[in-house]
C-alpha cells in the first residue's frame, strides 16, 4: 500500500524534478558522511599532535578543522533545504491528487446523499495525512541512508 502511494509521484509528470531533488538529497547526505570521515581522521592527527607536543602543527590543524566544519555545515544546511523542497513538491502533488479525487466526479455529493457525510474537514484531514506520510517516508529514507553509509564508512 505504501509503495503504491509513493510510486505514483515518482512516475508522475513531476518525476524528473523529483528524481533530481532526491539525487541531490542523496549526494548531500553522502557528502555529510564523507565530511564525518574526514573529521574523524582530523581528530587522530590533532590529538596525536597534542600528545607529541607538536605545537607547530596546532594552528594548521585548527585551520583544517575550520574548513572541514564549514563544509560539513554547508552540506547539512543544503541537505535540509533540498529535502524540504522535495517534501513540499511531493506534498503539494499528493494533496492536489487526493483533493481532486475527493471533489471530482461528485464524490462528496454522492457520499452526502448516501448519508455518509459525517466527516468534518476532509480537506484538512487529507492535507495532514499527506504531510505525515511524506515527512515520515523521506525521514526514514534519509535516516537509513545516512546510518547505512556511516556504518560502511566507519567499519
Language-model regions: role of each:
Residues 1-36, 44-65, 79, 83, ...:
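Membrane-integrated ABC transporters
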Residues 91-108:
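Short cytosolic helices in intracellular loops of multi-pass membrane proteins
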Residues 65-75:
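Hydrophobic alpha-helical segments in the permease module
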Residues 36-39, 87-88:
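Transmembrane-helix bundle segments that line or gate the permeation/cavity pathway
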Residues 14-16, 70-71, 95:
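A generic short-segment signal for beta-strand/edge and adjacent turn/coil regions
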Residues 79-95:
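Inner-leaflet juxtamembrane helices
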Amino acid at each position: 500500500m505504501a509503495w503504491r502511494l509513493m510510486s505514483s509521484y515518482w512516475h508522475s509528470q513531476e518525476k524528473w524534478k523529483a528524481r533530481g531533488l532526491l539525487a541531490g538529497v542523496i549526494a548531500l547526505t553522502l557528502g555529510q558522511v564523507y565530511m564525518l570521515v574526514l573529521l574523524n581522521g582530523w581528530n587522530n592527527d590533532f590529538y596525536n599532535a597534542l600528545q607529541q607536543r607538536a605545537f607547530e602543527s596546532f594552528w594548521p590543524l585548527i585551520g583544517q578543522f575550520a574548513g572541514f566544519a564549514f563544509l560539513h555545515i554547508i552540506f547539512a544546511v543544503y541537505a535540509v533545504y533540498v529535502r524540504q523542497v522535495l517534501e513540499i513538491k511531493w506534498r503539494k502533488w499528493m494533496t492536489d491528487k487526493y483533493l481532486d479525487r475527493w471533489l471530482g466526479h461528485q464524490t462528496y455529493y454522492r457520499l452526502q446523499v448516501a448519508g455518509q457525510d459525517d466527516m468534518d474537514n476532509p480537506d484538512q484531514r487529507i492535507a495532514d495525512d499527506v504531510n505525515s506520510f511524506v515527512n515520515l517516508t523521506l525521514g526514514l529514507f534519509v535516516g537509513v541512508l545516512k546510518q547505512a553509509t556511516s556504518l560502511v564508512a566507519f567499519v
